[in-house]
Amino acid sequence: MSLPRFQRVNFGPYDNYIPVSELSKKSWNQQHFALLFPKPQRPGTKRRSKPSQIRDNTVSIIDEEQLRGDRRQPLWMYRSLMRISERPSVYLAARRQPLKPTRTVEVDSKAAEIGKKGEDKTTQKDTTDSESELKQGKKDSKKGKDIEKGKEEKLDAKKDSKKGKKDAEKGKDSATESEDEKGGAKKDNKKDKKDSNKGKDSATESEGEKGGTEKDSKKGKKDSKKGKDSAIELQAVKADEKKDEDGKKDANKGDESKDAKKDAKEIKKGKKDKKKPSSTDSDSKDDVKKESKKDATKDAKKVAKKDTEKESADSKKDAKKNAKKDAKKDAKKNAKKDEKKDAKKKGK
């Protein structure tokens, strides 16, 4: 056997050397050729299963990105490199010597403890202050409510006092009115006294006037006689005027009665005229009814005639059809009889 040869196969940027013998090379070439260019199946022969067909010949898919030279780095590598570049090296942090403890640190720690205690105290004070403020607020609210109640009571008391003052003022007004009435009554009494004094004076005057009145009464009697005569004349004139007015009224009444009679006659005539057209309307209605009855009878007669004509025509058509059918039947029967007779004659 010959020495194994090295076959160079290119897979992207890497070079892999695979040792392949000549026999294996020949067999591989034959199988590869048979797969690429299979022989046509001969008639009458069964196809043998080849080992290359039994095996799972999956072709490896080569990515184009892998074949290219510019392969991207994985994400984890990229991230780690970026972190290293940003962050200082761990060795520097490890080699750094720890600082010596100084007094300032102790002082700072004490100050911090004191500050914490002070903060705790301030927080406690704040809480107590807030609680006290809440309590004070509640108390103030209660006080405010009490103050409001007191104000309302004061307002009610003021209202009551105002009402009392108003009532007192009304009482005073009524008292003043009564006093005014008393004063008015006194004034009336004084006026009455003055009137009585005047009456006495008038009585004395009337006594003085009586002598003058007697003279006037004599003159008045004469005047009364003259007035009576004039009154009689006036009564006579009035009686004449009344007679004239009564005559005029009677004349007017007569004219009015005549006019009323004329109007009544005209109204009666109008009613008669109205009754006449109503009678004519009734006559016209009767005529219309008679005409409608006549038309109805005429229409009924026409319809009956049409029906009878149709029935007669149908009966005639049926009779003709039946006659034709009977004639045909008779002709057929006669033809059959003649045929039978002819057949009998021929048989003899």
Curated annotation (Swiss-Prot):
Changing residue 184 to D: Found in a patient with male infertility also carrying a variant in CYLC1; uncertain significance. One of its GO terms (molecular function) is structural constituent of cytoskeleton. Residues 157-240 are annotated as: 3 X approximate tandem repeats. GO terms for biological process: cell differentiation; spermatogenesis. Transmembrane segments: none annotated. Residues 103-159, 166-217, 238-267, 276-342 have a biased composition (Basic and acidic residues). Sequence repeats lie at residues 157-184, 185-212, 213-240. It comes from the Eukaryota. Keywords: Cytoplasm, Cytoskeleton, Developmental protein, Differentiation, Repeat, Spermatogenesis. GO terms for cellular component: cytoskeletal calyx; nucleus. InterPro entries: CYLC (IPR026189), Cylicin_N (IPR029354). Testis. It is found in: Cytoplasm, Cytoskeleton, Perinuclear theca, Calyx; Cytoplasm, Cytoskeleton, Perinuclear theca. Residues 25-347 are annotated as: 31 X 3 AA repeats of K-K-X. Residues 35-59, 101-348 are annotated as: Disordered. Coiled coil: none annotated. Plays a role in the establishment of normal sperm morphology during spermatogenesis. It is required for acrosome attachment to the nuclear envelope, and proper manchette elongation and disassembly. PANTHER family: CYCLICIN, CYLICIN-2. This is Cylicin-2.
